[in-house]
C-alpha cells in the first residue's frame, strides 16, 4: 500500500508541474517552436479599453529558387540559389489620429509579402 502512495505523490507532482507550465504560457506559446504565423495582434501600448489597436505580427517563410542565368551573369559573385525574404505586413489598415496628433495605422488584415525595408 505504501508503494502506491509514492506513485500517487510522483503523479501529482508531475501533474502540478504540467499545470504550472500551462498557466505560465497563456497563449500556448510553449507549443510554438520558433515564430508564430503572420496574424493580427493587439498593440497593448496604443490600445485603450473599448478601442483596440491592432498590428501585424509573426513570421513568414522565405522563398528560394534557382538564379536565372541572365541574372547570374551580372553578379560579382555568382550564386546558384536566390532567396527572397517575405515579411508580415498589413494588407489593409485604417489611419487613426491619437491625442497629441499622433497618427498611426490600425491594421485590419495581414499577409506575407516581399520585404522592402531591411536592417543594414
UniProtKB/Swiss-Prot annotation:
GO cellular component, one term: follicle-stimulating hormone complex
Main location: secreted
Example of a GO MF term: follicle-stimulating hormone activity
Keywords, ordered alphabetically: Disulfide bond, Glycoprotein, Hormone, Secreted, Signal
UniProt cross-references to Pfam families, sorted A to Z: Hormone_6
BP GO annotations: G protein-coupled receptor signaling pathway; positive regulation of steroid biosynthetic process; regulation of signaling receptor activity; thyroid hormone generation
Localization per record: Secreted
SMART domains: GHA
Glycosylated residues, chain numbering: 80, 106
UniProt xrefs under Gene3D superfamilies: Cystine-knot cytokines
InterPro entries, A to Z: Cystine-knot_cytokine, Glyco_hormone
Extent of the signal sequence: 1-24
Cystine pairings recorded for this chain: 35-59, 38-88, 56-110, 60-112, 87-115
Subunit structure: Heterodimer. Glycoprotein hormones are heterodimers composed of a common alpha chain described here and a unique beta chain which confers their biological specificity to the different hormones.
Family label: Belongs to the glycoprotein hormones subunit alpha family.
Function: Shared alpha chain of heterodimeric glycoprotein hormones. These hormones bind specific receptors on target cells that in turn activate downstream signaling pathways.
Protein name from the UniProt record: Glycoprotein hormones alpha chain
Organism, as annotated: Nipponia nippon
Lineage: Eukaryota, Metazoa, Chordata, Craniata, Vertebrata
Amino acid at each position: 500500500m505504501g508503494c502506491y502512495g509514492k506513485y500517487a505523490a510522483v503523479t501529482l507532482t508531475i501533474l502540478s508541474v504540467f499545470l504550472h507550465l500551462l498557466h505560465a504560457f497563456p497563449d500556448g506559446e510553449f507549443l510554438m517552436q520558433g515564430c508564430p504565423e503572420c496574424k493580427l495582434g493587439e498593440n497593448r501600448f496604443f490600445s485603450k479599453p473599448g478601442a483596440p489597436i491592432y498590428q501585424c505580427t509573426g513570421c513568414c517563410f522565405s522563398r528560394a529558387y534557382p538564379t536565372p542565368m541572365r541574372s547570374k551573369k551580372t553578379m560579382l559573385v555568382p550564386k546558384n540559389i536566390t532567396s527572397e525574404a517575405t515579411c508580415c505586413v498589413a494588407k489593409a489598415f485604417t489611419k487613426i489620429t491619437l491625442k497629441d496628433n499622433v497618427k498611426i495605422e490600425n491594421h485590419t488584415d495581414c499577409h506575407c509579402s516581399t520585404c522592402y525595408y531591411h536592417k543594414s
